[in-house]
Amino acid sequence: MSLFLISKSQPSLSVQAKRLVAMRFLIYTGFQTSYFIGVIGTLTYADGASVVATSLAVLFMNVFVILGSFAGGAALDAWGPRRHFLLSIVGTLATGASIIAFGSATGTALAGAVLLGFVMGFAQPIATSYPAYLTDDPVELKDINSAITMFSNVSIIVGPTLGGFVAAAASSRAVFVLMMLFTLLALIAGWGFKPQEVRVAGRENADSAEEGERASQANRPNPSTSARATFAASIKTVFTNSVLALLFCIIFLSNFGYGAFDPLESFFYRDVLHVGVEWMGWLSSASGVGAVLGAVLALRLPPHLVNLKTLLVALMSVGLGSLLYVGTPYVGVALVGQVALGIAWGVVNPLHNTIVQTTAPLEQLGRVNSVMGFGNMFAGVAPLAIAPWLAATFGVQRTLVGAGLVVTAVPAALLLFGRRHLDRAVKQ
């Protein structure tokens, strides 16, 4: 069914690209049913936990998303997309079953954050790296990435909406059953996924050439000098390439303020907006509606606008949308803010992924994306140390408004004062 809908809405994509979009849509919908409601919602509403507990949950999740993304990138580079996808499916099913089996106590919710974070990170290359195994054409990559982003954002509508209804009818923990169901559907959609043979052969040839070069410098085989690029080489690739290095810094600095949102949003709903746990799903769905519109906008961007400057404008719009979202105590205004926020994110994600995929070497792409993801997630981890103190000192809403100001100010400052570096990177 999802393949049929994708075929109708994206007729220009190849069959394998449509299958990839369906794979990402289904597994990501499963994640979206569960994270916000199943972990943060359980802690806030069912357990009555403190801001410290929700901050710990977000910290654990972000740390293990980072670890999972490194593991997933390594698995992709070593074994290719098909085996990586199967491991993602098995890990997600095992996580859902474990969380359901062990109850909803605070300790279990925190352990669930660890497991869920790891499998979400492990599965990230499906969206960030798989497209490069289908084509190396920049325009086609932009179209695939925009379609993935658009349907990922449909996931942000469908997943939290269904999760909200399940939480209202049963419990916040029951959403993990939905996650497992969508994961099984993703397995069905991805069963016939086949990367382009030329692309896979090219990756293997690059690995073989590197292996030959290293073998000529050694008397015997050494696993530490494997043919495959190490993480150290991927880190070097990021920071010796002007575009990738600047992109890493942009995403890190722009997301630094956003890290305060995750542990405090549920308290904003409960104590400022005065709504129930189901609204955590429904307001997230509003963001998904906006993100679909943003992805459609990204799909229509001309090639000359697929660059770092456009990305900064989109990131600044994320900050402005977040200010509208948390700036008042009215749920209607928060709804509009979530739509605006979603539109901005819908443009950011395909731009970011396309820039990375057209810049990084394919044989290192999985781990280069892991390095980029590390910067993104670490930026979200750092504010968690002070989020509870800020909320206790200034209040939840004021802290969120301050975070929104940071998210807005960083890309604005980079646009105003970093134009020379941006121009140099764009020319290269």
Predicted regions and their residues:
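Substrate-agnostic recognition of the 12-TM MFS/MFS-like secondary transporter fold
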Residues: 19-36, 61-74, 80-89, 108-168, ...
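Helix-loop junctions on the cytosolic side of multi-pass membrane transporters
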Residues: 182-207, 416-427
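Helix-loop boundary and gating motifs at the non-cytosolic
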Residues: 2-63, 241-285
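Helix-loop junctions at membrane interfaces in 12-TM secondary transporters
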Residues: 101-113, 326-337
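C-terminal ends and interior cores of transmembrane alpha-helices
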Residues: 90-104, 316-329
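Transmembrane alpha-helix termini and helix-breaking/packing motifs in multi-pass membrane transporters
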Residues: 38-46, 158-179, 271-272, 382-400
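Juxtamembrane intracellular "pre-TM" segments in multi-pass secondary transporters
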Residues: 1-17, 196-248
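Cytoplasmic membrane-interface "Motif A"-like loop-to-helix N-cap segments
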Residues: 78-89, 303-315
